[in-house]
């Protein structure tokens, strides 16, 4: 069955891999968005012929507008964060896939849900920063929330037997361990962005690759899993699975465990979200068990990797705690990639923000953005 897809964040790592899936399935692209990569989105417009395109960066939008001038059948151009929400709200697509990086994707997620669209969610920050708002909107509008993160897709797939899902007692959330697995604090002190960007298994963008190196990504995924699957954080166990073959598992009341396995390729969870509930042939090679010499399992070291410890504190505090942790991390990673702070400073700053307030209680969307702003300012003032 052909589908129409709106893809938010089309020029990033998840976005381009999503287009691999869309191309292979022969789906129609209704809308695309990017932040600033004009050349790449021009190539995508040429191939996929979307009806609408949004550029959230004003300078990039002006360049794209000039490049599209005079073209026959050029897409309508939307601009800025409001343009992104306008695109997410438009009637036409069967699914909106949100692969925007960071809290910038939250508004579009909420708008898509409130407009009645099924949402394939790669933007984990939507749930981390505004989990209560997102899950409340999903329930109110009766749409599907389809996880795209490989771990959450794995859990989602393991829970498709609705009767067994009632007996869920534990989630085993797997982690690769990142490029610095097994290292202690002193060994991490001099690590550079070049070191941190060398992920052993996954092809990802710069921000999420740094998050994998600090284990912040796993902390964010823990928070995301709490909102997606309704288990308290103490029932979600993080297990380091270095080969990234077991993508996560669930345990039931009889202590049986069901896991989802596959090659480490993001196009598997992307495809499952876009074709759900169907399973169809795709672009990813099958897993050859005869090549697997071993599968290893280890404990995540949150004493060394303080971002993970900070996220656990944040979700226990509740309220805006996870939002504060995320905002601090986004700002700290930006500074690290600009060579303005060291690798260990990321965890120090995230934990300091989480420790700075109680953060409990209910919140509005305005509160989320205010908390994010506060966390970023805290980081900049505590360098």
Protein language model annotation of sequence segments:
Residues 1-383:
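Catalytic, metal-anchored helix/loop core of enzyme active sites in primary metabolism
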């Amino acid at each position: 069955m052909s589908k129409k897809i709106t893809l938010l964040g089309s020029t990033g790592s998840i976005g381009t891999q999503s287009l691999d899936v869309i191309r292979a399935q022969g789906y129609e692209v209704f809308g695309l968005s990017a932040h600033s990569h004009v050349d790449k989105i021009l190539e995508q417009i040429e191939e996929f012929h979307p009806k609408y395109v949004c550029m959230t960066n004003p300078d990039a939008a002006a360049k794209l507008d000039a490049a599209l001038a005079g073209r026959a059948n050029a897409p309508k151009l939307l601009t800025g964060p409001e343009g992104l929400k306008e695109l997410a709200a438009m009637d036409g697509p069967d699914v909106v896939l949100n692969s925007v990086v960071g809290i910038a994707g939250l508004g579009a997620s909420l708008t898509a849900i409130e407009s009645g669209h099924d949402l394939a969610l790669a933007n984990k920050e939507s749930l981390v920063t505004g989990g209560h708002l997102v899950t409340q909107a999903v329930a109110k509008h009766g749409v599907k929330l389809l996880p795209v993160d490989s771990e959450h897709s794995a859990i989602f797939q393991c829970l498709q037997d609705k009767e067994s899902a009632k007996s869920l007692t534990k989630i085993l959330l797997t982690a690769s361990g990142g490029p610095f697995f097994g290292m202690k604090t002193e060994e991490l002190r001099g690590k550079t962005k070049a070191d941190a960007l060398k992920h052993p298994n996954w092809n990802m963008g710069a921000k999420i690759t740094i998050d994998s190196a600090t284990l912040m990504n796993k902390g964010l995924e823990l928070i995301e899993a709490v909102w997606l699957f309704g288990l308290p954080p103490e029932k979600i166990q993080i297990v380091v699975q270095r080969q990234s073959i077991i993508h996560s598992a669930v345990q039931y009341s009889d202590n049986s465990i069901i896991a989802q396995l596959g090659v480490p390729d993001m196009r598997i969870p992307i495809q499952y979200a876009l074709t759900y509930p169907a399973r169809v042939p795709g672009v990813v090679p099958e897993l050859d068990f005869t090549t697997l010499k071993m599968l290893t399992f280890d404990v995540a070291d949150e004493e060394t990797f303080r971002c993970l410890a900070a996220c656990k504190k944040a979700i226990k505090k509740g309220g805006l705690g996870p939002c504060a942790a995320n905002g601090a991390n986004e700002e700290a990673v930006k500074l690290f990639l600009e060579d303005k702070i060291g690798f260990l400073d990321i965890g120090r700053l995230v934990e300091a923000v989480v420790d700075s307030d109680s953060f409990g209680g209910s919140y509005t969307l305005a509160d989320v953005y205010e908390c994010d702003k506060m966390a970023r300012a805290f980081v900049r003032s505590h360098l």
